Amino acid sequence: MLNYVIKRLLGLIPTLFIVSVLVFLFVHMLPGDPARLIAGPEADAQVIELVRQQLGLDQPLYHQFWHYISNAVQGDFGLSMVSRRPVADEIASRFMPTLWLTITSMVWAVIFGMAAGIIAAVWRNRWPDRLSMTIAVSGISFPAFALGMLLIQVFSVELGWLPTVGADSWQHYILPSLTLGAAVAAVMARFTRASFVDVLSEDYMRTARAKGVSETWVVLKHGLRNAMIPVVTMMGLQFGFLLGGSIVVEKVFNWPGLGRLLVDSVEMRDYPVIQAEILLFSLEFILINLVVDVLYAAINPAIRYK
C-alpha cells in the first residue's frame, strides 16, 4: 500500500506540469488586455505600456512561461496583478471559507443522500422510493444559481431569518451549503439506491435473514458495508464537484472564498491568481482520488494495491 501511495504521489509531478502548461496557454488566450483593465478606461497608450512593462507582459511568451514555471516549482506564484499582494497570501485568505463551506455541504449531503437512498432501496417500488427519487431528480434538475436566489428571496428577504452575505457565523453557512449540497445529495441518493438494490439481492443477505437477524441489522451491518465501495467513489468525485461548483454559489452569495476570487481574477485577467487557483484545484482532485483509493482497502480488505 505504501509503495502504491508513493507512486501515485510521484505521478503528481507530470500531471501538474501538464496542467501548468495548459493553464498558462489558456489564460494568455483570454480576450482582453490585463494592463488596460488595471490602468483603467481613461489611461492612454503610454500608461498602458508602462503597466505592461511593470507586469512583465512585454516579454516574449516563452520567457514569461519559464519565469512562471521556475518560480512555481519553488512555491512562488508571484504577485497578484490587481492587488499586488503575493498570490499565496490571496489564496490563503480565501481558502478556509471555501473549505468549510465544502465540508458543511458534503456532510449534510452525504447524510441525507445516503439515508434517502437506503430508504428508497429497502422500500423499492413503493411510495418512499418514489418520493425519494422524485426529490432527488428535482435536486439534480434545479440549477444551483436559481436555487440560491430562491433561498435568498424566501429565507432572507421575505422571512428575514438568515443572512445573505458574509462568513462570520454558522448562520451564514446555512443557505450556501444547502444550495451547494442539493445536487450532491440528489446524486448520492440515486447512487446509494442503485448500489443497495444490488446488495439486497445477494446470497449473504438472504442467509442473514434466514438466520433470524433483524432486517435493520441486516441492512446496516451487511448491506451498508458492501454497498459503500461504489458510494465512496461517488463521494470522492462529488467532493471535487463541490470544490468546483462553489464558484457559482460563492458568486451568488458573495462568499469570500476561492470561487469568487477565481471569478474576479478572470474578469480582471489576473493571470498569476488564475494559474495558481487552477493548479490548486487540480491538486485537490488528485489527492481526493488517492484518498478514495486508500479508503477502498479500508472498507474491503480483499482489495490490495501493488
Swiss-Prot record:
User: What Pfam families does its record include?
Assistant: BPD_transp_1, BPD_transp_1_N
**CDD domains in the record, alphabetically?**
TM_PBP2 (cd06261)
- Note the InterPro entries from the entry: BPD_transp_1_N (IPR045621), MetI-like (IPR000515), MetI-like_sf (IPR035906)
- Cytoplasmic face: residue ranges? 1-8, 124-134, 190-228, 299-306
Can you supply one Gene Ontology CC term for this chain's record?
plasma membrane
Main location group: membrane
Indicate the segments forming the ABC transmembrane type-1 domain, all copies.
95-292
Positions on the Periplasmic side per record topology: 30-102, 156-168, 250-277
Ranges annotated as spanning the membrane: 9-29, 103-123, 135-155, 169-189, 229-249, 278-298
Q: Where in the cell is it found?
A: Cell inner membrane
Per the record, the GO terms for biological process are: glutathione transmembrane transport
PANTHER family cross-referenced by the UniProt entry = DIPEPTIDE TRANSPORT SYSTEM PERMEASE PROTEIN DPPB-RELATED, GLUTATHIONE TRANSPORT SYSTEM PERMEASE PROTEIN GSIC
Q: How does it assemble?
A: The complex is composed of two ATP-binding proteins (GsiA), two transmembrane proteins (GsiC and GsiD) and a solute-binding protein (GsiB). In the presence of glutathione, interacts with the glutathione-binding protein GsiB.
Annotated protein name in UniProt: Glutathione transport system permease protein GsiC
